[in-house]
From Swiss-Prot:
Protein name: Epididymal secretory glutathione peroxidase
TM segment ranges: none
Tissue-by-tissue expression: Epididymis.
Keyword list, A-Z: Oxidoreductase, Peroxidase, Secreted, Signal
Length: 221
């Protein structure tokens, strides 16, 4: 099985060294709009195994970090860092949710059942498994984007003012608040309202510092 995975994903692995680059944004993080209509509790998503629709209202009272992920990306090194972030901040109510997507460099080519083996045996490999919930693979931009991402993007301006059109991106139409690449992040507060958004190039250490500063207002750290 390991050999089959390595052969099947040869092309995505060659592409994994490619991380979309843009002119450095003015900010790595942006606060979300103050007049957001609705909450994440109005939405749900299909679990990675396809057996369960998980309503986001089950995360009421939690601080939720939404991340669009990919197995064969140069930023896949963030997976272990996200595991550590979940472990460190879980006692303070943080929940990380991962959403596999193949729209950026086609770096999530497998079906849902192939994603966890790819992570475990290929990249990051060495038996790695995420300690946070993964959902079924789907679009985060374009006409078939998941509704939760329509809501998140509408609620939060993008840190970069540059809209990138590239042969490595696969969706239409292109919109100003679109996710630019794998591993962008949105933080949602315990009331279900989006709080802040990070550019994909923001280090997880920076994301952690920002979240801890935010949590300090709740007197939980």
């Amino acid at each position: 099985m390991v050999t089959e995975l390595r052969v099947f994903y040869l092309v995505p692995l060659l592409l994994a060294s490619y991380v979309q680059t843009t002119p450095r944004p003015e900010k790595m993080k942006m606060d979300c709009y103050k007049d957001v209509k609705g909450t994440i509790y109005d939405y749900e998503a299909l679990s990675l195994n396809g057996k369960e629709h998980i309503p986001f209202k089950q995360y009421a009272g939690k601080h939720v970090l939404f991340v669009n992920v990919a197995t064969y990306c140069g930023l896949t090194i963030q997976y272990p860092e996200l595991n550590a972030l979940q472990e460190d901040l879980k006692p303070f109510g943080l929940v990380i949710l991962g959403f596999p997507c193949n729209q950026f460099g086609k770096q999530e080519p497998g079906d849902n059942l192939e994603i966890l083996p790819g992570l475990k045996y290929v990249r990051p490999g060495k038996g790695f498994l995420p300690n946070f919930q993964l959902f079924a693979k789907g679009d985060v931009n374009g006409e078939n984007e998941q509704k939760i991402f329509t809501f998140l993007k509408r609620s939060c301006p993008h840190p970069s003012e540059t809209v990138v059109m590239s042969k490595h991106t696969f969706w239409e139409p292109i919109k100003v608040h679109d996710i630019r690449w794998n591993f962008e992040k949105f933080l949602v507060g315990p009331d279900g309202i989006p709080v802040m958004r990070w550019f994909h190039q923001a280090p997880v250490s920076t994301v952690k510092s920002d979240i801890m500063a935010y949590l300090s207002h709740f007197k939980t750290i």
